Amino acid sequence: MAYLRSSFVFFLLAFVTYTYAATFEVRNNCPYTVWAASTPIGGGRRLDRGQTWVINAPRGTKMARIWGRTNCNFDGDGRGSCQTGDCGGVLQCTGWGKPPNTLAEYALDQFSNLDFWDISLVDGFNIPMTFAPTNPSGGKCHAIHCTANINGECPGSLRVPGGCNNPCTTFGGQQYCCTQGPCGPTDLSRFFKQRCPDAYSYPQDDPTSTFTCPSGSTNYRVVFCPNGVTSPNFPLEMPSSDEEAK
């Protein structure tokens, strides 16, 4: 009987290890509430200052993203809206958020048994962010940051309430969105790259913006406002909300 119990425990631990390739710890250090979102797994969670949300991601998860929503109001059924990052007016996101929103993107257990991950500003910027492996292994497996005052310095043509749009979102077309083949940086995409060199500033900004870690042995942490401060042009106080059962 003891052998059976030991075998069952071993099987259970092996199953959990096999099922989940990585854990993502999402923390809000902003001096305001952030409604974190995660797709295709996780959904959404209200995070007041100092709160953390843990997401377990299965092997093979790809085209995944984590972002923060701001200035949200949800009712008891989880329906409402957000000023930035809104995902169809629901607390539990199943689709991508509406720009502008700073993105932590990842794909697990891909080529050569590597996780691929990045911070992207292709959908614009709303909240400062750090994205980091909790156990960095050197090379391209290290913390990356986008903590500049982008909202405060945003060009007038890209400025919107609560954030700063990417030129692809604002203007569209080949020049900014690379819709019909290769394209390069523009003056507007360089605005983002100069302030956040780790992050994607336009869709084909891969060489300096894609990071990798060994799959299955790396967990990650996403922190909103890692410095504990926010851009001057962003409101420090958000409207109260009655939504969400945590």
UniProtKB/Swiss-Prot annotation:
GO molecular function: beta-glucanase activity
Gene3D superfamilies: Thaumatin
Disulfide-bond pairs as recorded: 30-225, 72-82, 87-93, 141-213, 146-196, 154-164, 168-177, 178-183
CDD domains attached to this UniProt entry: TLP-P
Database matches in InterPro entries: Osmotin/thaumatin-like_sf (IPR037176), Thaumatin (IPR001938), Thaumatin_CS (IPR017949)
Gene Ontology biological-process annotations: antifungal innate immune response; defense response; defense response to fungus; killing of cells of another organism; response to ethylene; response to jasmonic acid; response to virus
Enzyme class: hydrolase
Enzyme Commission numbers on file: 3.2.1.6
Primary localization: other
Induction description: By viroid infection (tomato planta macho virus TPMV). Triggered by ethylene. Accumulates in response to jasmonic acid (JA) and acibenzolar-S-methyl (ASM) treatments.
GO cellular component, one term: vacuole
Subcellular location: Vacuole
Signal sequence, renumbered to the chain: 1-21
Alphabetically ordered keywords of this record: Antimicrobial, Disulfide bond, Fungicide, Glycosidase, Hydrolase, Pathogenesis-related protein, Plant defense, Signal, Vacuole
Stated role: Antifungal protein that inhibits the growth of several phytopathogenic fungi (e.g. Trichothecium roseum, Fusarium oxysporum, Phytophthora citrophthora and Colletotrichum coccodes). May bind to beta-glucans and have beta-1,3-D-glucanase activity.
Xref: PANTHER family: OS03G0233200 PROTEIN
Family from the record: Belongs to the thaumatin family.
Protein name stated in the entry: Osmotin-like protein TPM-1
Organism field: Solanum lycopersicum
